Regions:
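Interhelical loop and adjacent transmembrane-helix boundary motif
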Residues: 318, 481-535
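Transmembrane alpha-helices
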Residues: 423, 446-484
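Cytoplasmic-entry segments and transmembrane alpha-helices of multi-pass inner-membrane transporters
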Residues: 24-28, 345-385, 422-423, 557-559
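Transmembrane alpha-helix signature in integral membrane proteins
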Residues: 29, 36-40, 322-351
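Membrane-interfacial helix termini and adjacent extracytoplasmic/periplasmic loops
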Residues: 51, 301-322, 357, 362, ...
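Short cytosolic juxtamembrane segments of multi-pass membrane proteins
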Residues: 549-559
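Membrane-topology segments of multi-pass transport proteins
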Residues: 1-30, 50-320
Length: 559
């Protein structure tokens, strides 16, 4: 037998300890670095979302926002708002005046229709005056010539021909037979259009008309409907820019025109911005743009606004206005119901697998299926929920066939069930065997031992699974897309009265805005606001579960 002699190197144990210490420090550093990287990644990803989402609550609200809040939600001081509306209307009036004067020479169809209307009204006026037949015939013939000459001037793109036709109209301005009649409108229109002819390039009238339409649209988006106009049916068209950031985008659209030009032959077109002053150079509309630029603040009166009601208000006009109250309530309902469905079933399943089933082939197969179920794509759960809960099962119990909170909660319950089973199973296994042995030694049955000893001791670990399940259920979109979600909804009260109806949720509404027609570009603050609200809601639910878990753990330790 060969005996190994003890080491005669007195430094070897010290070297091993130093090596082990160095390895420990390396792994500790790597672990700390990983944690820092994860924290940094969270900050990089979440900070911009939370920052931009906060603009849904804290922003500079304009007078249009205060008007919308008063009319739709009954908030604010009506008398102060009325005074404010009068003040901004006075500042805006010159804008409408400049638009009207310029558009008279551009909207030729309106001018021609006005000329025809004057001709008809003049004929009716002659009938009411009982004008002699011969004089009536002469005056109607004269009015017809005035109408035709004015129409010829309007339709002409040659300045000389237009001035000549207008001259034929104004030649009769001093005719005493036309004094005090409707026909004087021809002379007023001829003088106004003569000024247009002097200042506008008639050959570019079609180009001016298109650009004028863009200017009108931008002004309408800024200030809302013009005073005296019919109220638009869509809520989003009833008000101007309700926020200063929205107003700045509309101001840019008003003050600059976007054009796509070919810089080099054979190369893709490039977008350039042309100032509106350059686009309307030499016309009476040029002063409008510096006027709006300099007095935009007076026209909209932006004020710092803390819109905390964003979290309780119903959405209006497809999330264009309003808040996320129904989305928060729908998310809470469907998440809580899903956990209520999954938690008892998950704990019972875990208890059976640990306490009763042993470790045979069937049990190993069941565990494999549970692990596989945890990796199934959520869209598959959504399709299963549609086929089984929505179409087959719930109608069998008298529920209406269709999407509902109940169907969505059952589907999400199946989705998070593997998470709860695995977490509960590990929590039950982690309970020291001495707890169970002591209870059984005192004469407790296996069921009573589990309910009174094992389950309370495993509760902190089970709550860990609940925390993970809440985060998963609240953020899912695909399953509720088929089983529970609608794009727009209102707050139902009491909440349990709506379990058989579809609901809107934060996750699905964020998706709906993102894929909607232009809505994400028009109101990005609402999309980020929904994401921020979802993050905060999940964080609050997780913190609540963590506090409950901590309290349970302290009670188990006797603190």
């Amino acid at each position: 037998m060969i005996r190994r002699l003890p080491s005669t190197d007195p430094l070897r144990p010290g070297r091993l300890l130093r090596l082990r210490g160095a390895v420990d420090r390396i792994f500790t550093g790597l672990a700390s670095g990983s944690i820092l990287l994860i924290a940094l990644a969270l900050v990089v990803v979440l900070a911009p979302m939370l920052w931009r989402g906060a603009t849904a609550v804290l922003f500079r609200g304009t007078v249009e926002f205060r008007l919308m809040q008063m009319q739709k939600f009954g908030r604010g001081n009506r008398a102060d708002l009325a005074v404010e509306l009068v003040q901004v209307a006075e500042v805006r009036q010159p804008v409408y005046g400049m638009l009207d004067r310029f558009s008279r020479g551009i909207a030729t169809d309106d001018l021609e229709e006005e000329a025809r209307r004057l001709y008809r009204e003049f004929g009716k006026q002659l009938d009411r005056r009982d004008t002699p037949a011969q004089e009536r015939t002469e005056l109607r013939s004269l009015a017809k010539h005035l109408r035709d000459d004015f129409t010829e001037a309007v339709e002409s793109t040659d300045k000389a021909a237009a001035r000549e036709a207008l001259g034929r109209v104004l030649r009769h301005a001093d005719d005493p037979r036309l004094k005090g009649t409707v026909a004087e409108g021809f002379f007023r229109m001829a003088r106004d259009y003569g000024h247009i002819v002097d200042t506008v390039d008639l050959s570019r009238r079609a180009e001016y008309a298109k650009a004028l339409g863009e200017v009108r649209d931008a002004i309408r988006a800024l200030f809302g409907p013009r005073p005296g106009e019919p109220r638009p049916p869509l809520v989003m068209d009833q008000y101007g820019a309700t926020r200063w950031d929205m107003a700045e985008r509309q101001l840019a659209r008003l003050l600059t025109a976007e054009k796509w030009v070919e810089v080099q032959p054979g190369q893709p077109l490039q977008r350039i911005e042309v100032p509106r002053e350059q686009q309307f150079a030499g016309t009476d509309l040029v002063p409008l743009f510096p006027f709006v630029r300099e007095r935009a603040v007076e026209m909209l009166d932006p004020r710092l606004t803390f819109y905390w009601q964003y979290f309780i208000d119903d959405s209006l006009s497809g999330h264009y206005f309003g808040g996320v109250g129904p989305e928060i309530l729908g998310t809470l309902l469907i998440t809580v119901l899903a956990i209520l469905f999954a938690l008892p079933l998950g704990v019972v399943s875990a208890a059976y697998l640990v306490e009763c089933a042993g470790d045979g082939r069937v049990v190993r197969l069941i565990r494999t299926c549970i692990n596989t179920l945890a990796g199934v794509p959520s869209i598959v759960f959504g399709l299963f929920g549609l086929a089984f809960f929505v179409i087959f099962l719930l109608p069998k119990f008298g529920f209406p066939q269709g999407a509902s909170i109940l169907a969505g909660a059952l589907t999400l319950g199946l989705l998070v069930l593997p998470i709860i089973i695995r977490a509960s199973e590990e929590a039950i296994r982690s309970v020291p065997p001495t707890y169970k042995e002591a209870a059984l030694a005192l004469g407790a049955s296996r069921l009573r031992c589990f309910v009174t000893v094992t389950l309370p001791a495993a509760l902190p670990g089970i709550l860990t699974g609940v925390i993970l399940s809440v985060s998963r259920a609240a953020g899912e979109t695909a399953p509720i897309l088929f089983t529970a979600a609608v794009a727009i909804g209102s707050t139902a009260w009491p909440p349990w009265s709506a379990v058989t109806k579809p609901t809107c949720t934060l996750a699905y509404s964020s998706y709906h805005i993102a894929v909607g027609d232009r809505l994400a570009a028009l109101v990005p603050h609402n999309q980020y606001g929904m994401v921020m609200t979802l993050i905060l809601l999940v964080l609050i639910l997780n913190i609540a579960a963590i506090l409950v878990r901590s309290r349970v753990a302290k009670r188990l330790r006797g603190q």
